[in-house]
A protein has these predicted regions:
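Residue-level signal for inorganic ion chemistry
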Residues: 4, 33, 71, 110, ...
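Charged, glycine/proline-rich intrinsically disordered loops and linkers
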Residues: 51-69, 158, 165-178, 299-301
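Active-site core segments that coordinate phosphate-bearing ligands/cofactors
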Residues: 79-94, 105-140, 149-173, 186-308
Length: 308
């Protein structure tokens, strides 16, 4: 599950411009840009902020490409992180879990399988942070992404004690390649840079948000913004999200981060990494006689199975 970051820039330069023109919106009315992205999707960049997969000698190296959220190649690293946290409180607010989809296991996977990528990477960040950084011409991080997927705490910062216990090199890697100004949800990550002002024809006063994890943005979309309200965002995977004024350890959650959805509240996340994908898998495994019957009834396979 790898992607090419150039596709993201093509959408920014062409897709967004098309939407602005097709919607016939008055560009003077555009005052802000919100960014959401599926997480944890990780990108490795050089000193010029260029994705490493653009380097001619790295084009055939899969680890130079964007690691999509559902890349699960770092399971061994995730398991080891859990093992090293036994009898510690490092994962109390992560449900005593580490997911192979998260940033730190993916960094360790690259260290183990493609150390040359790690050596040449100047920046490692969430793809959502990459988009925000491109739009603002700055190197910034969102508290939502780095909090849920990078073991960063609003008060204590990164858990370097935990990182050192996992790998003595890890604190240095994170400090040099991941640390940057962290912007909270609800704040501005900066003004839209001149390049994109010109590309989109927008004002220099347009503000860009820090990126928010895509499922978390759904909480805002349905208006479940009060403490105690619960939202299930169902799709390829499913995220269960809730807000509260307190932070307490809860088993089986996958994180709780302050100010990550609504300022002043802790955002709690749990969920299932495969939901829609499992339905599709089940459909694709249906025997031929089921598929034939569904076709006879002019029904999708899953709908036909539900009626059996």
């Amino acid at each position: 599950f790898l992607q090419n970051a150039d596709d993201y820039l093509q959408i920014l330069e062409q897709g967004v411009q098309y939407v602005l023109e097709d919607s016939k919106v008055n560009k003077n009315d555009v005052v802000g840009i919100g960014v959401d992205f599926t997480s944890s999707t990780i990108i490795f960049l050089d000193e010029q902020f260029e994705p490493l997969h653009r380097h001619e000698d790295l084009k055939t190296n899969p680890h130079a490409y964007v690691k999509l959220w559902k890349h699960h190649g770092a399971q061994d690293e995730a398991n080891y992180m859990i093992q090293m946290s036994k009898n510690k409180n490092w994962l109390d607010y992560y449900g005593s879990s580490v997911n192979s989809e998260w940033m730190i296991p993916k960094i360790l996977e690259v260290k183990h399988e493609a150390p040359e990528i790690l050596r040449r990477a100047r920046y490692i960040m969430e793809a959502g942070d990459y988009i925000t950084s491109i739009l603002t011409n700055s190197n910034v991080r969102s508290n939502c992404g780095i909090g849920f997927k990078g073991f960063w705490d609003n008060d204590a910062g990164f858990n370097y004690e935990f990182f050192h216990s996992v790998d003595p090199d890890l604190p240095k890697i994170v400090k040099e390649k991941c640390e940057a100004p962290i912007i909270s949800i609800g704040e501005s990550a900066g003004r839209l840079c001149k390049d994109y002002q010109q590309i989109w024809g927008l004002s220099q006063d347009v503000q860009v948000s820090p990126f928010i994890i895509d499922a978390h943005s759904g909480v805002l979309g349905v208006g479940a913004i009060e403490a105690g309200e619960f939202t299930a965002v169902i799709g390829t995977s499913t995220c269960h999200l809730m807000l509260d004024s307190r932070q307490v350890p809860i088993s089986s959650i996958t994180g709780s981060v302050k100010n990550a959805i609504i300022p002043g509240l802790y955002a709690y996340e749990a969920g299932q990494p495969a939901v829609g994908d499992l339905f599709e898998y089940s459909k694709n495994q249906a025997p031929k006689h089921i598929v034939d019957k569904a076709n006879e009834h002019h029904m999708p396979v899953l709908n036909y199975l539900e009626e059996l």
